[in-house]
Amino acid sequence: MPRSSATARKSHSNRQDHGGGGSGKKPSKQKSSGHLNATYNGTAGSETGPSSQVDWPSHRSGDQSIAAAAAKSNGPVDSLKADTNGRGYPGGYAKGNADMSYGQTNGGVSPNGGLAGPASRRTDKSVTGTKRTTSNASVNPFQLASTILRSCPMYDTIAILIFLLQLPPMVLTLVQFLFASLTFMPPSGTASGSFTSNFDIFQGPAGTPSLGTMIAMDGFCLLVWGLFMWTWAQNFALDLAHVQVAITLGGGGAGKNGGVNALCVGIVLILHLIRSKGIQDFVVGHLVSAKIISPDLLSHYSYLMPAEFKRTESQSSPSWIRSLLAVHILAQAGTAMARRSMTKNRTPAPSRSGKRVDTEASAGSQTQIDSAFESAASVSSYLGPDGQIITAAHKDGRDRLISAKKRRRQANQVRSRQPFWAALASTKVTVMREYEHSRALSKTARGLATTEDDLQGVSLDDGLVWITYVDSSTIKFAAGDFASSDDHSASGVCEAGRVSSEDAEPFYVCVNGAPWATVVITKEHDPSKASNTIYWRGEISGLAPNCAYTCSFVKCDTDEEICAMSVKTPAANDAEQANSVPAPPQPSYRPSSPTTTLKNSIINAEAKLNEKRARLRKAKNDHKLAISKIKKELDNYTNRLQSGTDENRQKQRSLQLERNIRQTEEATAALDNQIDNLGNVPDDEYQEWVEQKAKYERELELLKSAKAEIAATRTANARELSSLESELNSTTQRRERLQGRRTRVNEQYERIISANAQGLNERERRAAEQFAREQDQSKLEQSFNEQFASISQSVQDYQLRTSQLWQQCTAVEQALQQQLLMEPAPLTPEGELPGTSTFADAPSVPLGTLASNMPSHRSLLGQSFPPLKSSPLQHYASPIGTAPSHPTSPIAAPSYQPFSSSPFGNAASFLDPDFVYRDRSFSNRSARSSLYGSEFPDAITARRVPFGVDPFELGNEKRRGSGSDSTPLNGPSGLRPISSPFQRAASRASGTGSGGSGGSGSGSGSPSSARGKGN
């Protein structure tokens, strides 16, 4: 029957009690040995039910010792329940409840036959002191030396390093492989099933780096190894891996100072420097060149140097297997150093006091016990300072998880610093314990539960005590016969635990070192009903639930301790009682002191008393409510009875009730008779019943098949109905979509119709406007035609008058020519003398006479009168580009530069072309000269419009010609263009009238007009 994982972990971590080496520091003396010798070796099993631990007496001799040993090996346990058995084992170890913490150490055998050990609590302190003294004196130095090894981390580390450096390469590679594989193993504090969890794979167990961290560090160190390290550095790093293995196995890293690490690294560095060929050549060459050592002396003593130091060739690179192992070991060493330094930085500085604390003892007391509870999968509670167990429900989950992580981390850190020798000793202890455990199991009933019936036939002369049942507040036990052969009567009176019985108890009970009063011990008066080995039965009451107790059984006559048992009471089943008991703030893993035990018992008794009082009060209240309810019903019935006035009705009701009672009694009697008659069922009726039953079953099958068909039909109908409903829904949706689409199309159609109607109205409005515009244009055209007619009439009048004027001018010109011909020639060749000119004397002489004297025979009058026009619009044409209508007009003559026959002909005169075509000033311009003057040919040409052109088209042409690329109407002279031909006609008419009236007119163009201008 294998032991639980918690047992294996805890027994592996017990180094202080089973030969494990310390951390290198000398432990100081402890004031209380109970702290060191408390319950370290207890185990937490996985079985349910009570647990017990029995310390068997060791004062037997001869056959009694052999029989006792056999009985102890096959120690039976009386159990009242199959799942609440306890089993005693040699050495004080037992298998029990998972919430149980055992606490017995192996006591030494004293010469006087007493049982030595810290668990032997006696009322007589002197006897206890004597037993402890004799127990300590019984351990000789050889036994102590063979059990406990002295911790020498420096010596162990250096010895292991020297041993590793002397190993062959193949063996050394195997050692490195085994050491490297240990880094991937889960720590002993981790449960077997938790290695596959995400926490342990990716986060890493407490106290060790995670798998991802190890892989990352290995990859980084491998990159540095391949890129930056030469051959000598690789070989040096390979030996540094040996140093790490030696430090780990020898416990060199347990101390606070790094002296061991520096010494080992220095040894390896010196060896590599001495073995280096380059350094040897440099040192020898320097010594020889400096003439410190002669070559002859060097060759004479060179044989003293080991052959392996004489390198004739450079070192070769190590193999890739050894390189990978060395890289992994060094990477994990660096990670461990970094984690250790961070842990030291987070850890607060210890208090400065003169007292030196035993670090190994404190680690063994707290850390080792924590290691038994470090697996959250196997342990879900812990003990309080008074021995009570605090479950996970009584503590916050986050604090519990943090404390569990901290305990695992501390346990793994202490375990990682454990020296190699301590590990070997702990392994030896674990192996021996498992061997004893398996041997004890082989002698029992092969894993079957042991009961009191199994003790029959076993002779126990000196008695035996064992636990039979454990409750939350009571412990029941049974004992054998303690009467000796020479004394058949009780010789003493029990100090405590006495009951009202005629027979005196041979022993009394001490709980946690305190005599317990609430113990009931009874004797078996009828040995035939019980086992022949059971003489006494007892019950220890007044205990607190969820607490650990050490029950000692002491003889009344000699005050000798028979045995001691470590028992833990289970938690209370009653939720109210469990809530009434306060939870301890600090967990503890050993039994409490007598005072604390009594206080806890008193508190438990008071809690039970308060609970019973509360239940009593609750029962009283319930009874009061029930009584009040019954009283109300009684009053109701009384009122109804008193209010009943119809006696006939009451009589009929009573007769009916009597009739019902009589019928019920008759039916009951008939049923009784039928039951009596059916005592023996006939075979024919049985066969008929079988047939009817078969028929019933067939009908039932038919009914089931019909129901199944109905269900199938209903399902098919429901399916068809659902499909039809879905089709109906889809059709309805499609119809709704079509309706919506129809609505949208109708709205669009209405919008189009309204838009068309609006467009028709717009066309009608535009047509009306166009018609009105055409009417206006026709009216305007009619008015223009009327104006044209009037203008044409006026033009004809002007032409008549002009012809008359031309006739007059012709006559005047002829007269002037005749007069000039009649005058004599000048007396001098230079011309007329000053003062002799006829023009000054006769200003009324027409200019036509002067024109006859010019060599070109050009007339000044021809430059003043334009030709006649047949239309009023022909005045826009230039007189230069048109033929004269009058035969005597001088316009017919070509316009060229005249040449004089006299030497003075080239001189400028008022008759030259510059004078003839002289521009008029802007301050003296007549309407006729502005309209018909030859100085504005471009402007006149631009203003010329053909006859019969629409005025609107003329306006459009004017608008088109008003751009940048069109010719302006005012011409280059900068004159304002004439806005309308009607205005020009009017001005011409006015000018004509003024010319006819006198010589001062501005529009006639007559010589008098010219003279007027000249004046």
From Swiss-Prot:
**Compositionally biased residues, Low complexity:** 722-732, 1005-1015
Gene Ontology cellular-component terms listed: membrane
Record key words, sorted: Coiled coil, Membrane, Transmembrane, Transmembrane helix, Ubl conjugation pathway
Where is the protein found, in the record's own terms? Membrane
Chief localization: membrane
| Comp. bias (Polar residues) | 35-55, 126-135
Membrane topology label:
Multi-pass membrane protein
Locate the coiled-coil region(s) and give their ranges: 596-753
Highest taxon in the source lineage? Eukaryota
Segments crossing the lipid bilayer = 158-178, 211-231, 254-274
Enumerate the residue ranges of region (Disordered): 1-65, 102-135, 337-367, 573-597, 722-742, 952-1015
Record field: compositional bias (Basic and acidic residues): 733-742
Q: What does this protein do?
A: component of the regulatory network controlling carbon source utilization through ubiquitination and deubiquitination involving creA, creB, creC, creD and acrB. Involved in resistance to acriflavine, and required for normal growth on a range of sole carbon sources, including fructose, cellobiose, raffinose, and starch, and reduced utilization of amino acids, including GABA and beta-alanine, as sole carbon and nitrogen sources.
Similarity field? Belongs to the acrB family.
Please state what the protein is called.
Ubiquitination network signaling protein acrB
Q: Which organism is it from?
A: Emericella nidulans (strain FGSC A4 / ATCC 38163 / CBS 112.46 / NRRL 194 / M139) (Aspergillus nidulans)
Q: What gene codes for this chain?
A: acrB
